[in-house]
Every structure is written in C-alpha cells, then in structure tokens.
Amino acid sequence: MRQVNRKRPYARILPLLVIISVIVAATVTGCGTSTGSAAPASAAPAKQLVFYSAQGYDSAMAKAFQAKTGIQVKLVDDSTGKIVAKIDAERSNPHWDVAWFDGDSTMQGLDNEGMLLQNWTPKDVSNLTALGQSLVPADKAYYPASVTAAAAIGVNTKLLSPDQYPKDWRDLLTPVFKNSLAMNDPSISGPTYPYVAGIMDIMGTAQGKQYFQDLKANGLRVFPTNDNTLKALLAGQVKAVTIQDSALAAAEVKGDPIKIIYPSSGVFTLPGVIAINKNAPDMAAAKQFVEYVLSPAGQKVMADVKNGGGDSYFNPVINGIQPNPARQQSGINWVKVDPIKAAKDENSLKKWFHDNIVQ
Amino acid sequence: MITSSNKAEHTKAEHIGSRLRHWGSGAGDVPGAILLVVLIAYPLATLLGQALLPHLFSKPMSLLPSLAPLRSVFGSKLNLEALVNSLSIGLAEAVLAIALGSFSALALARVPRKVGVVLDAFIWVVFFVPSYVIAQGWVILMQDKGILAQLTGLPNGWSAWFFTRFGLVLIMGLRYFPYVHFGMQEALLHINQDLVQAGRAAGAGRRQIMTKIILPLLTPAWLAGGSIAFAEGFGDFGIAAAITPQAHIPMATYQIYASLSEAPVNYPAAAGMSMVVVLVTAAAIVLQFWWLKKRNYNTLSSAASRDPAGGSNRRSMAVGVAALLFVALFLPLGATLCASLWKTWSGGMSAGNWTLSHYFRALRLGGDGWQALGRSLEYSLVTAFLTMSMALVVGFQMSFKDSRLSRLLNILTMSVIAVPGIVLAASFIFAWNAVWLIPIHLVLYGTPVCLAMAYIASSLPYAIRLEVGAMSQLPANILKAAESFGARNRTVIRKIVLPLVRGTAISTFFMTFTGVMFELPASSLLYPPGQPTFSVLIQSKFDNFDWSGGAALTVIGLVVVFAAYGLGRCLVYYSARVRAEKAQQADRDMVPAAGG
C-alpha cells in the first residue's frame, strides 16, 4: 500500500506547477519593470516621474505637467498618513521622486531623517509672497505651494444665530458650546497636530494645555479624523468644529450650512509643501515638476475647484495669483508655527493630548 | 477587508490526518510550506523582526538587536489596557457571532428549500459588503439627528447607549456571524443521523437532541467560525473608529495606528504591538486545537440530513432569519444607499434632498475610473483563481499531513487575520523592496505582482480554513477504500477529493474575488504608481469629503460584485444539472443493457 503512495505525482506536481508559475510570473514582471520604478538603482531610460501626493489637485497637476513636458508622471494619491508611512517603509530603497502634502512639520520630520534634497532653489523662487518666503526652511528642503489654516472654526448655521458665532478660540469655552464642539485626534489625524502645536504657540504651553482641558470640561468631543468630525457637524450632532479650513470649504461649496470663522487671535499656517527625494531616481524631472507647480500655470491648475475640490480653496503664496473668490482671503491673522520646534515636540505633545484630552 | 466563510472542522481533519499519517511521506508538504513562507511568513518576519532589530531597514542597515521596542510595548500601561479591551471585545463579539450564526444555520436547515436559498444568498451578501459600508451605515442611521431621529423625531442623546462598546460588539457580531453560519451549515449536512436516531429511540426530546447531540457534534464548526470572528474583532480598527469615536476605547489596533502616525513613523513600535496581537491570536487558536483534541468529533456520515419540522415552526424560523438579515444587512446598507442619493449631507432625509446626480457623476468616471475598475476586476479574477488553487493544495496537505510544519503554518496563517491590514501591507514593502533583492532583480514592490501577492496573502488564510473544513468532511474510509483498490493518489485527488470539495473551492473563489474588489490597505500602500485600483478611487472620494460620491461608487462596485456572484452561482447550478442529467442518462443506458 505504501509503495503505491510513495509515488504521488499529482500531489507533487500540482503545487510545484503553481509555485513555478508564480515565480516565473514574478521574475518576468520583476525584471520587466526593474528598469522602471521598481529598481531605482538602475538609471531609467524613459523620462518619467514618480509622484506621491495627498493633494486633491494632484491628478490634474500630473496630467498638465505631462502634457506640457512629455514626461510621464506616475502618481500615487493617498492620505498624508499613508504617503508618509509608504515613504518611511521605502527608506532603504526609495522609489519616489516628489512628495507633496499639507503640513510642514510632517515634512520636517522626513527632512530630519535625511530623506529630502536640501539646498536646491527653484527658479522664480523670488515670486513667493512674504508669507510664502517665511515658510521656506533654512535648509531649503521643501517649498510651500499653498497655505491653508490648520484649524478654523466651522459652525452649523442652522443651529446657531449669527450673534452666537464665536469670534476667537476662547469663545468656544462659553455655555453655547457645552457638549457641542468637536475636533480631531492629533494622534490619528494629520493636520490636527499643527493646530494643537499652534495653540501652544499663541497661548504658551501651560495655558494652551489648560485651554484644551477647559474645552474638555465644557464637553469637547474628539473624533478620529475630519471624516467623523465633519459628519457630526453636518448631521447637527455638534454646533461647531475646529478643523482644517479647506475641509470646511469643501462642505460649504456643496451647499451644506457651514460658516467658516477665522479666530481673531490667529490661525495656524498649514502649508502644502512639496519636496524632492534626496536620492530621486528621476532627479531632473523632479526639479522641473516642482518649478512647474510654483509657476503661474501650475497654480492655476491648483486653484480650479474642478481639479481640487476643497483643496482648491487655499491662500496663494505666489505673487500675482488670483485666489479662488469663494474663499476668504483678507482679514486672516496668520500665525506661523515653527515646523522644526513642532516636529521636535510632536510625539510628546500628542501623547499629552491623548492621555489628558482624548482619554 | 477580505470577507470569507469558514467551514473548518479542524480536529476532524487532524484526526483523519493522524490516521493517514503514513498515507504520504517525505517532502509532500514542502510546496505548500514554500508558498506560505513566500506569501506570509517572510513579509511578516521582515516587519515583526523590527521589534527586535529596529534598524533592519535603516540606511545604513544595522543588525544591532534592541529590546527597546518590546520594552516600550510591554512597559506601557495604556498598551496593556488596549490589549485587554481588544480581547474582551473580540471575545464578546465572537460569542454573539456564534449565537447568531448557529441560529441562522440551524434555522435554514429547517426552512423550505426555496426560502432557504434566498435567505442563504442574502447571508452571502452580508459577507460581501465591505465593513466600512456597514459601519458607516449604522452611524448615519443611529447618530443624533441621524436617519432614525429624522424619521421619528427622537431627541439628541437617544442613541448614546449605541455608541459604546455594547454597540460595537453588536455591530461586529452582526457583521461576522456568517463565518459561523457557513461553517455550521456544511457540518450540519453531515451530522451522523444514526446518533440522532439513537437519541430518539432512547426517548430524547427535540431540545435534548439539540443540546446533547447536535450542538456538541458541531463544536468544531462553531469554534472554527467563532475563532475567525474573534480574530477579526480583535484586529479591528475601522468599525471601532466609526462606532465608538468619542467613547474612545483604546484598542490594540488604535495603538498600532498611533505609532504609524508618529513622526517619524514608528514601525518598530507597530511591530512590537503586532507581535503581541499575533501571539494572542495564535494562543487562542492553539487553545481551540487543544480543546477539540480532547474529544472525538469523527462522526461524519455521507447522507445529507434534513430535519423534518412542523409548518408553523418552519415559518417562524424563516421569519427569525429574515429579521436577523433585516438588522444585519438592510438597515446599514439601506442607510448607505439613502446617503448616496442625498444632495447634501446636512439635508438628510428631507424631501428636496434627493438626487441621482452622484450616480451619473460616478458613471461618468472618465477614462481613469473605468481603467481602475477594469484593473480591479483583473486583480480580482487572477488572485481569486490563484488563491483557490493554492488553498486546495495547502488545505489538502494540512488535512492529510499531520506534520509539525503544517500545524505551525496553520497557526501562523490564522494569526495573520488579526494583524491590521495596513501592517500586513507595510510588511510587503519591507519584504519586497529590501536591498538584498536588488542584485537578484527581485524587487517586486511597485509591480502588480507584489500587490497580487498581498491580496493572496490576505485572503489565503480564510480560503485555507474553508478548504480544510470541507476536506475534513471526507470520510477516511472512502480514501482508504480507493487506496485498497489500488488507486494512485492522483486518482484519489481527482476522482474523490476534488469533486467533493468543488463547492467550497468555488466559494473561496468568490470570496477572494469580492474581497479584492474592496480591499483597501494593501491596495493603497502597494499599487504600482499611476495604476490605482477601484478601492483606492473610492477612498480618495471619501478623503476629499465627497461621501455621497464615494457611496455611489461603492454601490456600483457592489452591483458588479453581485452580478459576478450571481453569474457564478448560475454556472455552478447549471453544471451540476448537466452532470446530474448525464448521470441519469448513464443509468438509463445501463438498465436496458442489463435487461438485454
């Protein structure tokens, strides 16, 4: 009996066939693409650009750039958190050329790890506005292409009368907002950390922490991300939220009853920053792309709501660019959050927030 | 998330396996082992390894070991609390899933066949619908000023009880009961009627037969389904984030996500926490094996059974399952459907707020959208086929080879279910983008192959469990009989094993097919630049606060999936009928021959 069973051709051949076919397919495809993005160690013959981005208008920008230059743009569009996770996981063998997302302290984190091309100056850099200039780091590792507010106050106009609208951050401590204010968890939501860091900046660390604790005592709700927070506002679960202004703008233009308020003591700059990989496989194309984004033609692509949705409601940082008229431009008191300090304090401040406010 | 069912009756398999220990010998389980190593063990090792070698992927690479990541995991009180929360929620939810799944399986065995087919198909739908649709649907329905409040004028705060861990357990139980249902359903067909008859003859009542004979005999089935439900709940992030956003129950996966959003991304900490998740799940599985080993469940009979029940009882059973489906499926799916038809989110259910424009917009996807849909269909078909084949091979080996290697791999593949998808996806970057692969041109990261491998890795554990379950139904006697008539293994597999597990193989195919269509973590971290999948496209709608657009795309994707599933079912039904006709024809041919 065993003699028969020792010969088991079928049982052995079938799995082997499967494995062989997988390995063959893998090798063929692996080799086939290794001249492209898969193995940056080898020089790419065809002109291309691998572009990681979390911006709403990235796809339109990629197409416009490709049409203008003939350089093929391969886009990976995702949330900032996933883009950064991907870049960090690739760090020993990076595939990307250009990265673009909101949040200079996050980008500063990548710079601190030595991943970004430093001391490169795009042409036309003198076109940056004063606000724009102030957002360029000393080592020139990344450039601002737009500015939004890390947090503004969004109120549901169906639930509050205009005289109840808050004017500044501290107005949110009044009984009007008892159990009716929400924000995001900075440990999970990317743009929320600059907001928390910004409050510490303008109020001082001790008072800033006290402010969040007072909000908590007034019934502040902390949701994981913009998604939950904005839905809570629209459904009427809360009367006001403090989240990134472009997210509020996105809902406002769709016809939802939202009014965006920029607190008088200041809102915190959340620049959309663009950077080049220090070991970019396609360095020349990468530089050309960043220059295109900062040019008037590129800015026009960004400001078109058809391309970027809510992300198109930004404040320009390039001189002579017409901002989207639907967005408030004047009367905003911008407070610049120092990205180097913010990046340094990030983990300890997030932990404090989690232990004292979220919990 | 890959949804799937489980029909594993592992111990039965092991029992037969141990009897057949000498049935095969030598290196028979090596091919399966290689598959699992390449697809699961190696990627996971590159990630979990960072818990001990935190600089494994730094530049320059360093193999300097460090206990710091593990110390930080075990030293933190919050992590401990998170683990306890995840465990208790996973357990509670698994118990609920077992109760619901047992009820639905037992009930469907009693209702009239036609009603049963319809209800069964809807349970498959519960299975297919992506978790985020269910979770989001419940939120839209239950929140203050949500759909229910709008329809009935309930005051704010009416649903506070729901957005707690009780609501979470409830939703997860409703989400994962099909695992138990499908496991039990198969096992129920093969209950040894002799034992039931014996019980009746000894004067046992209906209730006694159920509690003393049928349910104990089904232990492997509900434990196997329950263990998947546990692993799913233990490793959940999305449902908890949606249902309990403000109650904030720290769970193990929350801690993993928080370390992934640290700056720089703290992979060693995520690895340490994931390692704990894997160990706990593995311990749960080992415990289950140990529990099953103590008893003998080898009570298979080949005769299908159908318990005769009274008419009114049948009707109430059918109504019960329909009610379960109403809560588990129609409420959340209906809420999502409504939301996809709203002009504005804040407008809610008000009369003037309805539009089809999101669907028109979604169908006018443009070239990119259709390409993404086509791409996802291609991935789905290819990975479903490969997963089905591999699960057959590995399942066969696990069922009939009781080697330590296969048992270890079995535990490992199950543990993978509890690892958050994003962690498994990141591990594929580390594994297939590693510097040591550059000289041999095997940097698969960034190619479609890498994404397909990740899809297979995340669906294989479910598929294998399903195959092992189906194969454990094969009476060892048949195989032995075939053997003693001199049949070679090839013949045994082709003529006996394959025909008997055909249905399961087809189930694993559709499970993978639909899972891949909506899979997100691996898709978004691993898709080749410039070639997004359909799920990535949907997610980018949600990321840009176009919820109605995202919901409309999801519904379109679901329609595609249902169409594929319906087509598959028709094919199976048709081929079964053709086979039956052929067999009848053969019988008819035989009779005159014998008579003449």
Language model features with spans:
Chain A
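Extracytoplasmic ligand-binding site segments that recognize negatively charged/polar headgroups
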Residues: Y52-Y57, D78, K82, H95-Q237
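Immediate post-signal peptide segment of exported/extracytoplasmic ligand-binding proteins
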Residues: T35-V50, K63-T69, S92, T174-V176
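A bilobed periplasmic-binding-protein/Venus flytrap-type ligand-binding module shared by bacterial periplasmic
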Residues: A152-L159, A197, L270-D282, V293, ...
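Short, polar/charged alpha-helical segment
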Residues: V50-K74, A251
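Periplasmic-binding protein-like
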Residues: M61, A149, N179-N184, Y211-K216, V222, G255-K278, Y292-I318, ...
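Short, low-complexity disordered leader/linker segments with a strong preference
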Residues: M1-Q48, Q359
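A ligand-binding cleft/hinge motif common to bilobed small-molecule-binding domains
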Residues: S105-G109, K239-P257, K306
